[in-house]
UniProtKB/Swiss-Prot annotation:
EC number: 1.1.1.205
Binding site for IMP: 307, 342-344, 365-366, 389-393, 418
Protein name: Inosine-5'-monophosphate dehydrogenase
Cofactor(s) the protein requires to work: K(+)
PANTHER family linked: INOSINE-5'-MONOPHOSPHATE DEHYDROGENASE (PTHR11911:SF111), INOSINE-5-MONOPHOSPHATE DEHYDROGENASE RELATED (PTHR11911)
Pathway in which the depicted protein is active: Purine metabolism; XMP biosynthesis via de novo pathway; XMP from IMP: step 1/1
Gene name in the database record: guaB
Residues bound to K(+): 304, 306, 309, 472-474
Residues binding NAD(+): 252, 302-304
Self-association state and partner proteins as the record states: Homotetramer.
Family to which this protein belongs: Belongs to the IMPDH/GMPR family.
The keyword Cell inner membrane is annotated on this UniProt entry: no
Species of provenance: Aquifex aeolicus (strain VF5)
Amino acid sequence: MVEVEKKIKEGLTFDDVLLVPQYSEVLPHEVDVSTYLTKRIKLNIPIVSAAMDTVTEARLAIALAREGGIGIIHRNLPIKKQAEEVEKVKKSESGMIINPVTVKPDTRVKEALDIMAKYKISGVPVVDEERKLIGILTNRDLRFIKPEDYSKPVSEFMTKENLITAPEGITLDEAEEIFRKYKIEKLPIVDKEGKIKGLITIKDIVKRKKYPNACKDELGRLRVGAAVGTGEETLDRVAALVEAGVDVIVVDTAHGHSKRVLETVEKIKANFPEVDVIAGNVATAEGTKALIEAGADAVKVGVGPGSICTTRIVAGVGVPQLTAIMEAASAAREYDIPIIADGGIRYSGDIVKALAAGASAVMLGNLLAGTEEAPGETIYYQGRAYKVYRGMGSLGAMSSRLSSDRYGQEKMEKFVPEGIEGRVPYKGKLADVVYQLVGGLRSGMGYVGARNIKELQEKAKFVRITWAGYRESHVHDVQITREAPNYWVD
């Protein structure tokens, strides 16, 4: 028995440790919280939303990208629907829309209105067969139409005289001057032949100023990721997502250190070398190394730490999250590949600990599921608002069969769930939640004396605490009369 005990490693999680405060010359508002999701994708805040059907669809992904993070669209959707969610994010705003939605002059008004409603846009350029700009149709043109006008062509209503356009190569600052001078809302970009090449809107100029920290690609579009599995339709799903403009693919499984996942990563990288791939989940250095050597551009770490996950209890498998992060980081460091801490984050202080332990970013589910933008249903219980939150290993999530392969159960007639369905308190706007989380991160970095996340990882010193130390860390010997937005007790 003594020999067995010597072989058993100790596993620690966030509540087992604290960061030691150190000499600091940096204030919280001075720290740089930017990081890299992969070598090519920079985030302005180290927050990624979980690919869960009660957490991330287009609305939340847009809100998070505007704050500087990135959302991962869940895969519990048909391929076409998931691609549409990605497309909504990519088309939500742009420095310049490279391939703007257009209509032909003979397009019916009803069809044009449907297109505008689908993409939540207030107007569309009208082009001929050669894509030469011949007019523009906006809400103002359609403001006083009657029901009998729905079947008429847009050419009867579009603005075609004195169109204001701009040449290729125009800067956003120059475009802003044109908007101001002519008091227009949309500026088509055309080449020397008059063919449409892009579109700049006043809304994008306004959003650029309103969300200066937004996470955007080189074309000024918000970044977004999407999850895929390991099933037979995976490459078809990836193809549709890439066509929609996805920035990163996440091979999302419960056990990333497996033959099927490794082969899937290799296939995606071979067929779509232009897209970055994140793979997971793993909890060991060996699993991390295997995924990196298969071609993963980042590795997702976490087996069973999530609030709605029962893997550790049902299967008896897992590694406490802090130890898992440290082990994975030690392996990833040799390849200069980022890792993402997925699960177990309850407070902003846990984010600081996860990053200090070696993660480049954290993936959040529970902390974001209660936001207004999350797709979970809003319910009321005893006079208080909640939002539905469920694990992707829950019976409800797996019943669609689209996510059951995450737990290797896609061919089973009766599922063995590794997650539960529950509710979390409604928290309001995502921006307010993220503000508190990033504020806590900034404070933690200030205490450690770290100007950026790299310095945090270099300077971090952990101290292990006892149960008494943990109890002392929380509010004690008092009744809370006014709750804080960044602290709660179970």
